[in-house]
Amino acid sequence: MKLTVQQLVRPEIAAIGAYHVAAADGFIKLDAMENPWPLPIELQHELAAELAQVALNRYPDADGGGLKAALRAAFAIPAAAGIVLGNGSDELITLVTQALARPGAKLLALEPSFVMYKMNALFSGLQYVGVPLRADFTLDLPATLAAIEREQPAVVFVSYPNNPTGPRYGRDEVMAICRAAPGLVVVDEAYQSFASDSFMDLAGELDNLLVMRTLSKLGLAGIRLGYAAASPAWINELNKVRPPYNVNVLTIAAARFALKHLDVFNRQAAELRAERAKLSAALAALPQLAAFPSEANFVTVRAPDAPALFQHLKASGILIKQLHGSHPLLENCLRLTVGSPDENAALLSAIQRFFV
């Protein structure tokens, strides 16, 4: 007798929905923390010429065509740290959870945070432990340390700064987590280009620290490249579960090209930080909204009726992220990506119209 799909699929997988990506054609797209600017036209032409030389008939080499060395030089990755590349940071999370999924092992994360920590615990068979943030989205360090002591997790994920809330925890707080954790601590620095601190200087020095980043928020979301730095012992184990040739030759070539022009992306990041400050101030000036501090390229707000404001913005041609309903602490919250000056002006105008 043949079994049905429902009989074959794990019950915990059958019970969830697939990750939903909203259709964005025709919208001002402020839902996914993307850089609003394409490459300058002259760099587009140079990149096209570079990609035309890529040998598409060959697999990528084991070192990523020199990409690891380029990343190390561009982002001051310590010489003591090894590097692993991923098809976006999502794949790096998968590698970590797969490598650590012993029977009974636990993954601990702060909540609310990046949804893929919890999802990958489910996919890999790790027990998930969530530790709530305080109501203002700051870290409850005593509760976190108590949970680490009680649960003895194999891995702790810390989003630094935190998505989807925006604040960056104190460096001393994260150091306390590293000291208390019996296993690996993953510091996810996806938004490092917009933040005032980094743990990259300790990669390879702290034995239980892995620093994870992506080029997506910098302006290269389309090429799907993540990288992580940690002691060589950790990188060696992650490479055992990493699929061969996981980063394709076009991504490698595009990333190496972009790193030669990092000044362009750094200028854009600086402009987005300035726009974030303006947007945050304008949102905070609206008495109907509570705007939370952010060191990322988005601002999270709480509104009296977030679903209604979300629908109003959508009807106005602006797509944002509705957080309401995803976690109790995110009740009536919305996440607004920092866009270009014109996009931010349109967003503010639409919000102001809603409250008239």
Swiss-Prot record:
Cofactor(s) recorded in Swiss-Prot or TrEMBL: pyridoxal 5'-phosphate
Modified residues (N6-(pyridoxal phosphate)lysine): 217
Statement: the UniProt record of this protein carries the keyword Repressor: no
SUPFAM superfamilies in UniProt: PLP-dependent transferases (SSF53383)
Catalytic function, reaction form: L-histidinol phosphate + 2-oxoglutarate = 3-(imidazol-4-yl)-2-oxopropyl phosphate + L-glutamate
GO molecular function: histidinol-phosphate transaminase activity; pyridoxal phosphate binding
EC number: 2.6.1.9
GO biological process, one term: L-histidine biosynthetic process
Keywords: Amino-acid biosynthesis, Aminotransferase, Histidine biosynthesis, Pyridoxal phosphate, Transferase
Assembly and oligomerization: Homodimer.
HAMAP family assigned: HisC_aminotrans_2
Family indicated by similarity: Belongs to the class-II pyridoxal-phosphate-dependent aminotransferase family. Histidinol-phosphate aminotransferase subfamily.
This protein's name: Histidinol-phosphate aminotransferase
Species annotation: Chromobacterium violaceum (strain ATCC 12472 / DSM 30191 / JCM 1249 / CCUG 213 / NBRC 12614 / NCIMB 9131 / NCTC 9757 / MK)
Gene from which this protein is expressed: hisC
